[in-house]
Regions:
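Beta-strand-dominated extracellular/periplasmic modules and repeats
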Residues: 2-111, 117-119
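Compositionally biased low-complexity segments at domain edges in trafficked proteins
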Residues: 114-133
Length: 133
């Protein structure tokens, strides 16, 4: 089983983004399928990819604290495909700032027993994410 946490930093202001709505969703259905690719030269290869046709089901909902952290998203998650959805539109509107991103979704695969820390660096018109520790 795995755990998930996140940290949102407002890079335009140079400080943590407090009060950002966050929800964790799990893909229901889908699964791994084999896809075969071929080239004009006649060579081919097969790879395992995740079938993304399943429905998204909410697992939990929270908001970032004063330090921009969300520590209570989930504990003991089974393996699967998940996404964290950040309500960046509301956060920026509350500060009278405009953005082209009403929400930002980070989709990731959770496999085995591990901790997944997925920070979001946010500004009005850009964002970056990475797997933290």
């Amino acid at each position: 089983m795995s755990t998930i946490s996140t940290h949102v930093l407002d890079t335009a202001l140079g400080k943590p983004a407090a009060g950002v709505g966050v929800r964790l969703e799990k893909q229901d259905g889908g699964g791994w399928i084999e896809v075969t690719h071929s080239k004009d030269t006649g060579s081919a290869w097969t790879e395992q990819v995740h079938d993304m046709s399943g429905q998204w089901v909410e697992v939990s909902r929270s908001a970032t604290d004063g330090d921009g952290r969300c520590r209570d998203l989930a504990q003991d998650l089974p393996a699967g495909v998940y996404r964290i959805v950040f309500d960046t539109g509301s956060y920026l509107r509350n500060q009278r700032r405009a953005s082209i991103y009403p929400e930002i979704a980070i989709t990731f695969t959770c496999a085995g027993e591990a901790h997944y820390h997925l920070p979001l660096l946010l500004s009005d018109n850009s964002y970056t994410t990475y797997r933290g520790s």
